[in-house]
Amino acid sequence: MGKLDGKVAVITGGTSGLALAGAKLFVDEGAHVFISGRRKEMLDDAIELIGRNVTGVQGDAANLDDLDRLFETVKQEKGAIDVLWTSAGTGEQGKLGEITEEHFDSTFGLNARGTLFTVQKALPLFNDGGSIFMTGSNASLKGYPEWSVYAASKAVQQAYARVWLSELKDRRIRVNVLTPGQVATPKQEELFDEATKRQFESLIPRGTMGHPEEIATVALFLASDDSSYVNGMELVVDGGTAAV
């Protein structure tokens, strides 16, 4: 018996990295999973990798029309949601004196605004007793130089969780934040050279980056009844980086 048997999960940004690993694990544990992403090729590849009990919807989590289409698809195919993982996000470096309006708006547009409206538009379909969690970042805890916009856009999510759990308590919907540190994903490979990756690893007490599957197991915990008494919390999964 799987931990998510009969459940319906929606994962934004579910076409790569830790969210894709989570989507695959959720299906293995009995869920039907809806994943969304902007790039059709990546969406098709993710569906093929997961292999079963998955529906892909192309769209941008910062675009409200795309969000409407995502949840209309969920409504037509399954009628309700038990788990929502908002993992669509973006970020780039920028020194304080060089941050542009476009940089700020695009980062907050997806990480903060997109997250809020994803949750808002999911709520009419949500079963009471469900689980919502958002992907944070330990950048909001560590103060890495040149990451102020990204860090601030992720810190928003802890505030969301604290407020929303109060608003949703009568429906027994839990709201948490899953906060990874450095994880070896295709995005990391794209953003950072080997020297930068080695520098990041030097900050991690265990000496190596995390793997998507290590984050996925924590996501499964938050999605399942194993975390039934966990609400309004930020679970930091970064190999101890934020603690030292």
Residue ranges and their predicted role:
Residues 85, 169, 174, 230-232:
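Short, small/polar-rich loop/turn modules that mediate ligand/substrate recognition or access, typified
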Residues 124, 165-170, 228:
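Alpha-helical segment proximal to the catalytic Tyr-Lys
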Residues 95-96, 100-108, 188, 200:
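Substrate-binding pocket helix/loop in short-chain dehydrogenase/reductase
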Residues 125, 209-237, 242-243:
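C-terminal substrate-recognition "lid" of short-chain dehydrogenase/reductases
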Residues 137:
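Residue(s) in the substrate-gating loop at a strand-loop-helix junction
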